[in-house]
Every structure is written in structure tokens, then in C-alpha cells.
Amino acid sequence: MGLPGVIPALVLRGQLLLSVLWLLGPQTSRGLVITPPGPEFVLNISSTFVLTCSGSAPVMWEQMSQVPWQEAAMNQDGTFSSVLTLTNVTGGDTGEYFCVYNNSLGPELSERKRIYIFVPDPTMGFLPMDSEDLFIFVTDVTETTIPCRVTDPQLEVTLHEKKVDIPLHVPYDHQRGFTGTFEDKTYICKTTIGDREVDSDTYYVYSLQVSSINVSVNAVQTVVRQGESITIRCIVMGNDVVNFQWTYPRMKSGRLVEPVTDYLFGVPSRIGSILHIPTAELSDSGTYTCNVSVSVNDHGDEKAINISVIENGYVRLLETLGDVEIAELHRSRTLRVVFEAYPMPSVLWLKDNRTLGDSGAGELVLSTRNMSETRYVSELILVRVKVSEAGYYTMRAFHEDDEVQLSFKLQVNVPVRVLELSESHPANGEQTIRCRGRGMPQPNVTWSTCRDLKRCPRKLSPTPLGNSSKEESQLETNVTFWEEDQEYEVVSTLRLRHVDQPLSVRCMLQNSMGGDSQEVTVVPHSLPFKVVVISAILALVVLTVISLIILIMLWQKKPRYEIRWKVIESVSSDGHEYIYVDPVQLPYDSTWELPRDQLVLGRTLGSGAFGQVVEATAHGLSHSQATMKVAVKMLKSTARSSEKQALMSELKIMSHLGPHLNVVNLLGACTKGGPIYIITEYCRYGDLVDYLHRNKHTFLQRHSNKHCPPSAELYSNALPVGFSLPSHLNLTGESDGGYMDMSKDESIDYVPMLDMKGDIKYADIESPSYMAPYDNYVPSAPERTYRATLINDSPVLSYTDLVGFSYQVANGMDFLASKNCVHRDLAARNVLICEGKLVKICDFGLARDIMRDSNYISKGSTFLPLKWMAPESIFNSLYTTLSDVWSFGILLWEIFTLGGTPYPELPMNDQFYNAIKRGYRMAQPAHASDEIYEIMQKCWEEKFETRPPFSQLVLLLERLLGEGYKKKYQQVDEEFLRSDHPAILRSQARFPGIHSLRSPLDTSSVLYTAVQPNESDNDYIIPLPDPKPDVADEGLPEGSPSLASSTLNEVNTSSTISCDSPLELQEEPQQAEPEAQLEQPQDSGCPGPLAEAEDSFL
């Protein structure tokens, strides 16, 4: 088939003639029609085929990018046709043919018809391809087509990667080829013609990373004046290779502008095309379009912008203000004018023809800003408007081409206020009331009256007054405008002809800003005397009510007695939030109840702000002793109900904890028929601080010899040779020690016992039947009739005693920690000394005047021992057994300073709190060894989780004591558990199945969580599981003292043990002499041992 490159002139002239005829002839709406019809045809090789396409306008045939040979004609019915004749066809004629309207000769019609022709050619399996079509570029993961087109639609075609025989499963279309998603590889198509395999050309697929096109178009100015320049930028982000094409108004006149390409390297990269017209003309107004395309995938985008070229600049108002603008006094007011202008104008604000400027004090603010390219807003902000700012304002906006101005009046509205309301009594008997007020706008005056003075302001509407026809009242009003103040003043005078009873008259002024009123009571000329009396009574009542309120507030702020001991119920997962047992909800066991007639109160051992501790004699507490000296805790008669509840809570906690050798044990209680009494053990030598102060001289005298180190100290039951007691040291039972009187006030009001029991009176307590072992050093002491086991019966205070005190306190606190009990006030003042230097932990804050005690600091309605408290307790109110460990470290410092006051160098103010936060710790005491001070430092760790538990402190202190001391302590502890001590007996009555054997505590465990309840011990607050006897026996190391616990022995003995009575054994075999006397070394500077050698604590 011949496809000439140039159409002959005759044919061209025919087409022009047909076009003219079409323009002059009738129009039809008929579409394109191909004859013969069909989507595809299969032709025999070397055959001839004719296709005719007709339409309502000149039409033509297209094959791909070529124009095949065709003949155009105009039919008689007014339609146009084109005949395509294919002669001697070959396989190369296979392809698609399009019939389209000839756009260059007719209207722009976009309709087109397609037909596909196959010419099977055995010599040509695949259609030949141009070399550029063998390279296929794809972007991202989009589908593409490998154009393996064949001449015969009956052939089966497969796609392979080159050099791989396995075909790929990709959809195939005989007219298009394989369509799918391909990787960056080389592909080949295969088919079979007869018995011959035919391969296509090799296709190369390449993936290109082409990001999406992001086009932005902006102009320096979209509005320009004639003669100014136009500059438009078209910017593409993130693409490296793009094509720019501009469309602009000058193109119509053939005046082209060469754009400039600008490369801006960076992340991301930018490419820009700049279209610049240096001198704008009015004809340059219009739309400027920037079309950007990517040559790889023909993807593109375009943006347009409108440019207006004006002959001259302009200024036009868009939003104006009214002729009168209102501002309210002392409120900010913004006056805003919106206008449109080009170029940007200058703006001035004037008040009363004087130019305004920004106020340095911020009272006036001027601003003009762009809302858009040619739209502006100018604002005048008056901050807290004043009356002087009222007046006439003008806003001027101008430039060299145009000017506009706006004028208005600013009125400042002032709230109305009554300045004066006065009453006068002229001589003619009239009542004259004058009301003067001011405001802007002009206020209106309203007078009203009410005769029921009690109900008038609340329930009755006043009756309006005015000029009465009966001439009972006359009203006169004058209005004046003050130009300087820019407000109106109203003066209204009301004249009442006759007033026969008290009358309430109200003057009310009102305007748009609100109203104000005042009232005056008009009375007859003779004022009744009862008004004066009533006023005085009311004033007195008000003063009385205020005084009562003040007294109630002071009473509520008065400190209350609070129990310091708390029992932990549960702990949060992070270990920083604790829930404590509410002791109010605990039951009280009546087995602890002691009849009041079996208790005889004696002298006061200590008294405080909330209560007192009294020495007493109890009858019938034990089987072996008819009477027993005890200590009784009680509240004052003025105690509040909350304080009584606190004391009852303390009783419940003590009754549930159980007995222990180093805790002041509960012996009984009186809760019925009178005030609450808590009966505890009596410790004759008072608290540890007072004990250390009283015996400090014996310690210092013993260690005054510098050649006698503490390690040479021996455990002795007798005085060293050559050591004599000072003459002023009295060791009798009644005067040696005793409770430290913690209150200087001896006149304590006791609750009369006669009110409860008529046959019981206060009596002096007789001296106990037992005498202190110290008495054997006093010539007048009677002969002792028995021998008791004591930890230490030496009257001399030794270093071993200090370590022993620390060891015993640690044992007692370990017992409380095992019960989840937090002490919260562990200090030397709350540790008592008993016979044989046995120490017991207590809480006698009830008997201490904490409001005058410098050791307690007021915080809210309570007093806190801040010097003994851990940082988490001071700053976060967190109390745990490990915060008690911190307090134990302070107690060690007290012991080894012989009763010193902690932090002597720090005042109790912000300096103390800042020092604790910075990690300040007290220095090593003079009498403390390095081992003791190391224990103190462990107790003072900043993070409470790293402090050692009391079980570990017991072991650390136990290592510093000799075997003799530990054995005697263990012996005393065992005798205590086997005795008929009242605490033991009553606990056995409540828990008959509890074994006396104590299981050693696991030193690695710290009490963080509450122990789960056990059914067999359901009376305990937080019960512990029953230990197995055989396991406990095996776990107890030989020679080590048993740790504290509340378990009891079922075996009762006939003897009774008291804190101050020597421990008597059931059957004590004949004892030999305690220890052989050791010879005193000659010429020794150190006192020699006289009895059993004291084990070194080092």
C-alpha cells in the first residue's frame, strides 16, 4: 500500500471545496460511521480492502502517527466521507486505524472511530518495533504494556524473562500485548508458527523514581500599574527533570516572552521558571498559566494566576463606621476601618484635627495590616477608655494617586451613679430630699417610696412618686451637660408636704449603661427613742456572733491527740502508697477488761496537753502476785470525743499486737463505767534520755583513763575494784530514776474515782516487795531472798550497755515490723528502762506536753517530731517500717551521744529542711565506734528501699555483742515467755493454739506488703502463719537469741514476771557462784574483773 508523504494539490483543492460546501450547506448531527462496521478484521495476505468513514464534517483516516492514502468526498445528503483503500496487504499493515474529524478544516470535534486489522503473515510472527519502543520506562508500581503484537490473532504468545524458559503468567491482548506490573528486567515474547518457534525483539523495562508533581505559581504583585513590571514564578518541588510551558495574554499578539529557569538545590530540590515582563501594559491583564510535565510518563500539572494591570492607583473603603460610635467607660474599644488600595497607602488617625500616635503607656494603639494583597485593615484601639477620649475622629488613607477619609464622633458612655442623696428639714415643716447624679447618656430619674420599712427592700415594690395633684409632693429636675467631662449631671429635688410616719424614699437613675439607686429613710421631726435602742441591740448581737465564730475557729485549730502507731493493710504496686488499718473498726476483746475496784491510782508519772500517765497498783492481774505496780494511761477530763476514740484505737492495736520482751506490754484496760484507762507495764527507771543523762558521769568516769580502750571493757556483775559510787548516787527502789516528769504542772485534775466506785480511793503506792539488785551495794539494803536472771545488774553505764540498748530496741522494732506496725515516733524519749537494763519501746506522747516540747513542731492540728522523721515522711507524709529505720538511726545517735539532741547545729527552720533535702547527715558521735556509725549511715539512706530492715539491724548489732550478753538476753526472753506475766496469760486465753517457739525472720525480706489472713489466727490484725515446730527448731541457730514474736507457750508457770520484778524460774536448781573471782592485775591502770568476764562488744 502506498502512503505518500505529500498530498497532491488537486486533492487538497477538493478538500477545501468540500469544506466550503460544508460551511454553506445544512448541518446534521450525524456521527462518524465506518463501513464495513466491526471492531477488527482479519485480511488475507496480498489482498485489497476498502474502508469508508463518513461524518457531518470533513473526516480523515489516521494509522498510528501516519496519514494513510485516502480520498475525501462530499455526499449528496450533505455528509462528508473518506475512503481508505488498502492494496496488496502484508503483515506490516496489521494495526489500528482511526477515523477522525479534520480539525484543521472544520470545527473542533473530538469524536473518533477505531478499527483494528490483522494480516496473518507466516514470515512475520511479531510486528516490527522501533528501537525507542523497546525501552519501557515505568514509575512506582503502575501497570505498563510490553507491546508484543502479532499479525495473526490465532497465535498463542508467551512472555519470558530473557534466558529463562519458564513463561510468566501475565494477561495478553493480541492488539496490545502483555499488560501488568514488571520488574527491572529484560523480557522476550515467544510464539509458534507451524513447527517453528518465533521470538520477538528484546524489551528492556526500567523503573524510575518520579515523585508527584507539586506546582505552585505566585506573582510579586497580581495588581500592577501601567509601566510597572510583572514577575511570575512557577516552582516545582522534588522533581529533577520537568518541562515548563507558559500561556499568557501576549501570546495572542505574537509577542513572546522568554522565561528563565532557576535551579534551587537543597532538600527537597526546587526548579523554577520565571516569567518577567519589565513594562506592563493594559493588554497584559489576564490569566497566566504554567504547565509542568514530566517527560518520562507524560504526567503533568498546571496552575494559573490572574494579573490585573490598572492605569492608576486607587483607594476604596469597604467597611466603614457610623457617624457616632459608642465606647463604654473603662472598657477597651476597637475602631476598625477596612479598605482596598494599590499601591499601599499611608494611614493617619486624627482626633479633633490633631494627629494621633501610639501611646507609650499602652493606652492607645494604632495598627494597619494587610488582609490580602490589596485589602487592608486599620485599627485604633483605645485601652480602658477614658472620658477625655470622647470627640471627633478622622481616618485618612492616601498615596500619590488617590485619597480617602472617614470621620465620626466617639461618644463615651459613663455608667450612671448617684453622687448625693440628702435630706433637709426646712422651717416650714416640709421634708426636702435632693438627689444628684451623673452619667452618659443622659440619666432618667425615678422616685419611689415604701412605708413598710421591714418588707420594702425585699418583697414590696416601691410606689412611684411625682408631682401630686393633692399637693402632697412636688418634684423638680434640672439637667446640665458638662462639656469638659462629656457627661450629663441630673439634680432632682423632691419636696414632701407632710410625713407622719417613717418612710423609705428611693432615688433611681438609669440610662443605657445601667442604673444606680440610693435610699433614705424619712422620719417625722421627732425620732422615736426605740430606734436607738434597737440599733444598739443589733450591734451587740453582731459582736457576740463574731466572737463565737472566732472561738469556734480557735477551738478547731487546737491540736488533738492522735495515735502514732499505724498498722499497714496493703501497699501499692510501686511501693509508694500505703493503706493503713482503721483501728476504729477493730473489735475489742473483753478479756483485757479489769474492774475499776481492782485498780488504785497513785502519783503522776508524766502529764501532757492531752492526758497523763499515772502510777497505780493493780490487784489480781497475776496468780503469783496479789498486787502489781503498773502504769495507767488516761485522757484529761476535757478530752474531746475524737481523742477518746484515738485512745481506744491505741488500746485495740496494743491488744492485737501481742506480747514482746522489748515492748511495753498491755496488761489490761478499763473502758466501762468511766474514763478509758490503758494499763501497761511499769518501768521504774524512766525514759532512755533521762537515764543516759543521769548515768552519764559513770560512763565518762569509767572511760576517763585514756589508757583503757573500750575493747578492754569486761562484762561484770560487780563494781570494778577501786571504783566507788558517788555519794549523791542513790540506788534505792523508790528514788532511783522513775519516770521523767514531762510536765512542770503538778496540779493535774484527776477523774474522781469516788464517782465510779464508792469504796475505791486514791492511795499511796507501797514500796514493791522486790528490791533492785543495785541495793546490794547499799549497806542499808535488806537481804535478798531470791536470785533472778538479769541482762546486766551493774550500776555502771558501759559501752556494752549502749550497744545492748540498741540491740534490744532493734529486736522490739523487728517485732512491730513483723506485725506490719509502723511506730512513727521512735526516739529515745519513747524507750523506757526497766530492771536489769532491759529496754522497752512505748509511745507516751499522751503524757508529754508536746505543745511546749521543742522536739515537736506544729503542723496543722498536730505536732510532728521532725528531727526524727525520714525525708519521705517529712515531705511526702509516707510512713513505713523503713521510715522507722531512719528514726532508729537517730535513736542510735542519741544513745552514743549519751542523750544528745539531734541536729544541734541546725535551727528548726528552712535551713533544716534544705539541709535534709541536700543529703546532710550528722557526724559520728564521740562515743560511737566505726561499726556503729556505719549502721547509722545505712539507716539514713536517701531512698528508703535501700535501708536495712530491722531483722538485718538485729544481726548487725548482734555481731557487736559478746556471747555472754546474748545468752543472758535469750535466757531472759525465754523466761518471759514461760512466766505467768499478765500479757502472756491473756494472750494465751485468746490464742490457745499458738506455740511458744519463735521462727527466725528472713533477713532479706522487707515489709512492703500486708500478710494474707490465716483462718487459724483470724483475731490478729494481719496474722502470720503458724510455724511448724520441727522446722523452727532446725532453723534456729545454736547460741543465737530468738527473735521477737508474739507467739506464746501453752505452758503456764506459777511465777509472775513484771518489767521491774526479777524473773523467777519455776524450778531453779541450786546455783553455784556466778563466776570465780579473777585476780586483780597488779599495777594496772584499768579496773580488773571481779566476776564473770564481760564479753567484748568489738
Curated annotation (Swiss-Prot):
Subunit structure: Interacts with homodimeric PDGFB and PDGFD, and with heterodimers formed by PDGFA and PDGFB. May also interact with homodimeric PDGFC. Monomer in the absence of bound ligand. Interaction with homodimeric PDGFB, heterodimers formed by PDGFA and PDGFB or homodimeric PDGFD, leads to receptor dimerization, where both PDGFRA homodimers and heterodimers with PDGFRB are observed. Interacts with SH2B2/APS. Interacts directly (tyrosine phosphorylated) with SHB. Interacts (tyrosine phosphorylated) with PIK3R1 and RASA1. Interacts (tyrosine phosphorylated) with CBL.
Catalysis performed (reactions): L-tyrosyl-[protein] + ATP = O-phospho-L-tyrosyl-[protein] + ADP + H(+)
EC class name: transferase
GO terms for MF: ATP binding; kinase activity; platelet-derived growth factor beta-receptor activity; platelet-derived growth factor binding; platelet-derived growth factor receptor activity; protein tyrosine kinase activity; signaling receptor binding
Low complexity bias: start-end ranges: 1062-1082
Keywords from the named record: ATP-binding, Cell membrane, Chemotaxis, Cytoplasmic vesicle, Developmental protein, Disulfide bond, Glycoprotein, Immunoglobulin domain, Kinase, Lysosome, Membrane, Nucleotide-binding, Phosphoprotein, Receptor, Repeat, Signal, Transferase, Transmembrane, Transmembrane helix, Tyrosine-protein kinase, Ubl conjugation
Active-site annotation: D825
Name under which the protein is recorded: Platelet-derived growth factor receptor beta
